[in-house]
Amino acid sequence: MLFIQCRLIMRKILILFAVALIGFASCADSKQSITITVTNPLALERVGEMVEVPMSDVVAKLKLADTAQIVVLDVDGQQMPYQVTYDEKVVFPATVEANGTTVYTIQPGTPAPFDVVACGKYYPERLDDVAWENNLGGFRAYGPALQARGERGFGYDLFTKYNTTEPILESLYAEELNPEKRAKIAELKKTDPKAASELQNAISYHIDHGYGMDCYAVGPTLGAGVAALMAGDTIIYPYCYRTQEILDNGPLRFTVKLEFNPLVVRGDSNVVETRVISLDAGSYLNKTVVSYTNLKEAMPVTTGLVLREPDGAVVADAANGYITYVDPTTDRSGANGKIFVGAAFPAQVKEAKVVLLSEKEKKDRGGADGHVLAISEYEPGSEYTYYWGSAWDKAAIKTPDAWNKYMAEYAQKLRTPLAVAY
């Protein structure tokens, strides 16, 4: 009898053990994860640099349902901000020491709310501007309504930013375009021009009210880094965009697709340019991918920074893949500080140089002195990728040397990207 009781007890223990194993396996499945190993091959620390993992790989490895959510964890198990982009990539900021490796984890879970850092908007009420920003600065491209008025704004414009890391452009536009205040200004101009001017300055985004401003001049130039085809030594200037589509709008990446009216290139009047521009949180530079449809032959393509002083501080370094310029801003007294502009290139640049304009050309280019250009070769059917952007000496980057160091290191990082394995 005792033997039978012992057998029954052992059987119950085995059943309980089997149930426990099944429960453990089920728990393990619920915590299934992907280990993301990020390796930095450079002797430079990489801080907050976006890495990308295809969402399709995440779904396949985690066997996720369509409605499932994920979290990205650092080595301490703390959640990282991330974004799933329009082209189905999980992007998140990685920090990796020089010649080092950092491990992150992706697993099913409910993500914490993240602050929106990179974002933008289409402003039909401001002549079709598309304006976007991150924690470091803002940018804009001009649209068809501006072109229809006959204004010539070919290049990218800039908004400086300091004293905040939060989005400011929407509030700047709202104040600049406030209809009640605009009506009041129009009324005051008839009776009290001084008061009208004071109110105009109070709402203008061309005046610094403590968080930044637009004090950059563009006009009929390449502005802060537009790319253009070249016929010999002649730049074929693009005009304002024709259509826009915002593809990503934060929290970590803003992406917009711009398509342009046909260009006349060597007698062909049907060459259409498309740009896809992306700005990531924590970066001074926008990634831009340019393509030209209906182009029949290889041509030089250049990225340019407009020069507003012929003897301004310029770096044109083709070998190391970057160009920079110190812009005096629209106020040459120095009250607005200096804007540092630059472009960096992941592929080899054929030539980088300063090209000054003749007196006649200056008049046609709104008084600009010239451009610093980085020239490459564009093959029909390909994509031309480069990065452009700016910093302000009233914010974190104070000197031309600091900006040139940032740009040189950025170009190095483009040519030696982080390695992502999983």
Identify the residue ranges that each predicted region occupies.
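Alpha-mannosidase-like glycoside hydrolase catalytic domains involved in N-glycan trimming
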Residues: 30-121, 126-127, 153-168
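Bacterial Sec-dependent N-terminal signal peptides
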Residues: 1-34
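Polysaccharide-binding surfaces and accessory modules of carbohydrate-active proteins
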Residues: 31-33, 300-358
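Beta-strand-rich recognition/accessory modules
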Residues: 89, 96, 345-422
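Acidic, contiguous internal or C-terminal segments within carbohydrate-active enzymes
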Residues: 243-301
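Short, hydrophobic/aromatic-enriched beta-strand segments in well-ordered soluble domains
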Residues: 100-112, 256-260, 343, 382-394
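Solvent-exposed N-terminal domain segments of exported/luminal and surface proteins
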Residues: 110-233
